[in-house]
Amino acid sequence: MIKENVYFDGNVKSLGFSQQDGESTVGVMAPGQYTFGTGAPERMTVVKGALTIKRVTDADWVTFTAGEAFEVAGNSSFDLQVEVATAYLCEFLPA
């Protein structure tokens, strides 16, 4: 089953799906600044565009571009700065 997710007044949209190796979402973020909370640990891969992020454990902002990935701990949060419309894959990791 495919689940549609809409955040931040429609500026972030994703489609959630399940496979044998777990849950994932694929989506697009419009330019803007966002803060996301996590339940499970996540791996975010930038498909096209760029995400500049700051996790709770980061001292500075870090930019990831197409083909690059980062992980965020479960029960945490991270801030995002998005300069151009960006596509991403989010994989939920085992706790």
Swiss-Prot record:
GO CC entries: cytosol
Disulfide bonding pattern of the chain: none
Molecular function in Gene Ontology: guanosine phosphorylase activity; purine-nucleoside phosphorylase activity; pyrimidine-nucleoside phosphorylase activity; thymidine phosphorylase activity; uridine phosphorylase activity
HAMAP family, alphabetized: Nucleos_phosphorylase_PpnP
InterPro entries: Ppnp, RmlC-like_jellyroll, RmlC_Cupin_sf
Top EC class of this enzyme: transferase
Function per UniProt: Catalyzes the phosphorolysis of diverse nucleosides, yielding D-ribose 1-phosphate and the respective free bases. Can use uridine, adenosine, guanosine, cytidine, thymidine, inosine and xanthosine as substrates. Also catalyzes the reverse reactions.
EC number: 2.4.2.1, 2.4.2.2
Reaction catalyzed: a purine D-ribonucleoside + phosphate = a purine nucleobase + alpha-D-ribose 1-phosphate; adenosine + phosphate = alpha-D-ribose 1-phosphate + adenine; cytidine + phosphate = cytosine + alpha-D-ribose 1-phosphate; guanosine + phosphate = alpha-D-ribose 1-phosphate + guanine
Family listed: Belongs to the nucleoside phosphorylase PpnP family.
Pfam family for this entry, one: Ppnp
Superkingdom to which the source organism belongs: Bacteria
Gene: ppnP
The protein's name: Pyrimidine/purine nucleoside phosphorylase
Keywords, in A-Z order: Glycosyltransferase, Transferase
Gene3D superfamilies noted in UniProt: Jelly Rolls
